[in-house]
Amino acid sequence: FLFAQLSQMNRICEQRLKLWNCYHTLLQPLEEEGLLKRPFIPKGCEHNGHIYYIVLPSEEYRDTIMDHLKQNGIQGIFHYVPLHSSPAGMKFGKVMGHLPVTEGYSKRLLRLPLWVELEESVISKIVNQIQRGLEELK
């Protein structure tokens, strides 16, 4: 399985970037309205498009959008637990003080579906459902 993917690596990476860019373009108006934040890629940097996420204004917004997507057959998931609060981090890590930025992002970040065979028309439907969910929160 891995060798088959490696032999198609360039095609897979190009397709993932194409889908990532589709999300990025379609979500721009929602970011301009201040309803969410999209990933920021600094000038001169490249990425491989392996995930697409949005950052919502609050944990309530994230959970509401995640539930709205689920009700419409779309799986969006929270992306990460901060390392310092993970079971291993709590056991082995050393944290000096509170980490409000890390903890805040972990509660507001929502990862959207992205895989090589996802179609742009499906991304359009996902973005439409995000927009509908945000309208319900207004």
For each feature predicted by the language model, list its residue ranges.
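PLP-dependent aminotransferase class I/II
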Residues: 1-138
